[in-house]
Amino acid sequence: MAAAEPGARLVLYTRENCGLCDELMAELAPWLSARNLALDVRDVDADPVTRRRFGLKVPVLTVDGVLACYGHLDLAAVERLLDS
């Protein structure tokens, strides 16, 4: 696997009381730590535009603004985006 772009921006869109969001974050945390990557977590309900964009489709994980996965973690997709 190629090294991830140092400036890669990972954003996780979540909402309060979202079990899938909690599961995805728990799965993702050790992977991020092992790669020394930061995660920007945003509440979709805090912004009307973001709420309209994603609706009930949370959690949503993006890499540099590109959809990597939603609902469940797809590490292969995340790694492909980081390596591209």
What is the predicted role of each segment?
Residues 13, 42, 70:
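Small/polar loops that bind or transfer phosphate-bearing groups
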Residues 63-84:
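Non-catalytic, surface beta->alpha helical segment in thiol-disulfide oxidoreductase systems
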Residues 23-26, 53-56, 73:
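Generic recognition of short, well-ordered alpha-helical segments
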Residues 25-43:
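Conserved helix-turn-beta segment immediately C-terminal to the redox Cys motif
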Residues 2-31:
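Local sequence-structure signature of Cys/Sec-based thiol-disulfide redox active-site neighborhoods
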Residues 38-57, 62, 66:
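Thioredoxin-like thiol-disulfide oxidoreductase module
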